[in-house]
């Protein structure tokens, strides 16, 4: 039997302020609200579901257990310059990037959203990632 390949289509992010995060995801990334969550909202770009959850900075599980989770997320854009203008206008702050001519690398630019969450944008993608996919039937 062939090994199945599973597709990542959902990420849950702990945010300090759901309303601020939701507005940023709408304004910066053009995402839309897909529904409510128990402690937040579900956003979508038409392919991915991203839950923005108010967890008060607490990790799941044991209260004093170290939390290991999402360090940042990335978005594949058509026009990097336009995307940079859009995320900055929505309140993002630039803090780094990988030079476009670094060998064995892809170019990405890192930002923090208004709640402090780290994300990057790229027009060249990531190894193994596919930019456009066919959505599931409704």
Predicted feature locations:
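Vicinal oxygen chelate
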Residues: 1-4, 7-16, 44, 62-138, ...
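N-terminal beta-strand motif that seeds the catalytic metal site of vicinal oxygen chelate
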Residues: 1-20, 49, 70-77, 124-138
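Amphipathic alpha-helical segments
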Residues: 17-32, 89
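Short secondary-structure junctions
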Residues: 30-36, 93-98
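Conserved short beta-strand elements that form part of the metal-binding/catalytic scaffold
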Residues: 32-66, 111-113, 118-125
